[in-house]
């Protein structure tokens, strides 16, 4: 009987999901994206060669693995085409391996224009969006005016819907934001060309998934961003526009929740965040600079440097609860090599030193939180390439055990380097 596993980030994204997904695709028949868009960045390093994907599931490099983009993803046709062509140049048969739901809302030029105009208007209160139209595309979905992949394949339906939605967007762009309108002819012509490119990849993804399930195949659901960026459960409003938590997998694919067997939470051995928003354990000293330098903390999508801080057990406990995390994959443990002291946030206090209890539901709560730390001894030995848990330095083992106690779930996988063979698999989610 097959296993159906959700893999997602438990922090603010950039946890190293791409490498872990690629490692575990050895055992799967399909990898499925269920939310987000091309604002995600998945970096894969195989035999020293780096491939960065933003939209296509990380399993695309694996022969025999079907990659599926589910209905919960907002799809930029231009971004998808660029990725597919790059993969084809590398000899990867991306068109054959990729299937796309006809129900995916499209990201079109007016979404990008409104996204960038709004962020500019916010000034110092900007949210930190990538400016790629993700949020506005999700707005259209909820407002029931989205143009979806299936609409694009019908030229008359596409023209009718595009005319209607452009009237709305061009009014807002010109009258409120005082920027140039978007040309109907340009969007329509480009859309028709893109329709023919997409057509071979569009499929009934719900039936495809359930056929795989009935056949006893292993299926992986690949999350984008991180749990603390979830539109409902993250540091609102400094969040993304989709449900990045495990509940997004059933909704974003049409795969019933009771068919899911395991949730793997990808977690850095420290904490990072890109862009604006609260970050209780953020460091502004040499320790923070060292983590960023050793961890090469620059966003795969934006190139922006990431803010760095110590491990936050409080935020992790929250992520474990809202995702029903079965086990953790701890990444970038090697970045802590050479640290004399490592701090772990075990609780929050307010400005007066009083304990903060319960779950925080917005950015105001997180901004008032002050981290309460426990100091643990570091290690001087290298963890890179360690082949099993016992081969890790004693203090590294103790650090991992402490984190397990704090968050209440086991560390099932440990990443000690960027290459997929630099990984300790204690318990494989697909073989339990």
UniProtKB/Swiss-Prot annotation:
Keyword flag Ligase: yes
Annotated binding of IMP, by residue: 14-17, 39-42, 130, 144, 225, 240, 304
Active-site positions on this chain: 14, 42
GO molecular function, one term: adenylosuccinate synthase activity
Subcellular location: Cytoplasm
Residues engaged in binding Mg(2+): 14, 41
Short name of any one Pfam family annotated for the protein: Adenylsucc_synt
Keyword annotations of the record: Cytoplasm, GTP-binding, Ligase, Magnesium, Metal-binding, Nucleotide-binding, Purine biosynthesis
SMART domains: Adenylsucc_synt (SM00788)
Note describing how the cofactor binds: Binds 1 Mg(2+) ion per subunit.
BP term (GO), one: IMP metabolic process
Cleaved signal peptide residues: none
Lineage: superkingdom: Bacteria
Binding-site positions, GTP: 13-19, 41-43, 306, 332-334, 415-417
Catalytic activity: IMP + L-aspartate + GTP = N(6)-(1,2-dicarboxyethyl)-AMP + GDP + phosphate + 2 H(+)
Pathway membership, UniProt: Purine metabolism; AMP biosynthesis via de novo pathway; AMP from IMP: step 1/2
Co-factor requirement: Mg(2+)
Entry keyword annotation includes RNA-binding: no
Residues that coordinate or bind substrate: 300-306
Family: Belongs to the adenylosuccinate synthetase family.
PANTHER family associated with the record: ADENYLOSUCCINATE SYNTHETASE (PTHR11846:SF0)
Known role: Plays an important role in the de novo pathway of purine nucleotide biosynthesis. Catalyzes the first committed step in the biosynthesis of AMP from IMP.
Subunit structure: Homodimer.
Protein name: Adenylosuccinate synthetase
Organism: Marinomonas sp. (strain MWYL1)
């Amino acid at each position: 009987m097959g296993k159906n596993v959700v893999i997602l980030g438990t922090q603010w994204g950039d946890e190293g999901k791409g490498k872990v997904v690629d490692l575990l695709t050895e055992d799967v028949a399909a990898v499925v994206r269920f939310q987000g868009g091309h604002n995600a960045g998945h970096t894969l390093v195989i035999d020293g060669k780096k491939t960065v994907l933003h939209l296509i599931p990380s399993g695309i490099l694996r022969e025999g693995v079907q990659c599926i983009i589910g209905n919960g993803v907002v799809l930029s046709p231009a971004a998808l085409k660029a990725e597919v062509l790059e993969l084809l140049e590398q000899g990867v048969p991306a068109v054959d391996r990729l299937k796309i739901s006809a129900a995916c809302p499209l990201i079109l030029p007016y979404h990008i224009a409104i996204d960038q105009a709004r962020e500019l208007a916010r000034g110092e209160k900007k949210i930190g969006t990538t400016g790629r139209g993700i949020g506005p595309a999700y707005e259209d979905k909820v407002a029931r005016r989205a143009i979806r992949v299936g609409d694009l394949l019908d030229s008359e339906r596409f023209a009718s819907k595009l005319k209607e939605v452009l009237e709305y967007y061009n009014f807002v762009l010109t009258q409120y934001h005082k920027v140039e309108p978007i040309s109907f002819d340009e969007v329509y012509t480009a859309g028709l060309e893109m329709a023919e490119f997409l057509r071979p990849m569009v499929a009934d993804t719900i039936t495809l998934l359930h056929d795989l399930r009935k056949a006893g195949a292993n299926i992986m659901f690949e999350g984008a961003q991180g749990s603390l960026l979830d539109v409902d459960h993250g540091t609102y409003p400094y969040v993304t526009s989709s449900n990045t938590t495990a509940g997004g997998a059933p909704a974003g694919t049409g795969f019933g929740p009771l068919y899911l067997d395991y949730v793997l939470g990808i977690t850095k051995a420290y904490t990072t965040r890109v862009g604006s928003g609260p970050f209780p354990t953020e460091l502004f000293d040499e320790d923070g600079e060292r983590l960023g330098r050793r961890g090469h903390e620059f966003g795969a999508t934006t190139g922006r440097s990431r803010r760095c801080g110590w491990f936050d057990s409080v935020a992790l406990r929250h992520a474990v609860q809202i995702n029903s995390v079965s086990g953790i994959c701890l990444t970038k443990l090697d970045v802590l090599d050479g640290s004399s002291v490592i701090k772990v946030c075990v609780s929050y206090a307010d400005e007066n030193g009083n304990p903060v209890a319960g779950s925080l539901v917005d950015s105001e709560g997180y901004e008032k939180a002050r981290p309460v730390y426990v100091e643990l001894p570091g290690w001087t030995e290298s963890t890179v390439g360690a082949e099993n848990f016992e081969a890790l330095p004693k203090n590294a083992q103790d650090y991992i055990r402490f984190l397990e106690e704090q968050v209440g779930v086991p560390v099932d996988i440990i990443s000690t380097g960027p290459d997929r063979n630099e990984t300790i698999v204690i318990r494989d989610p697909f073989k339990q």
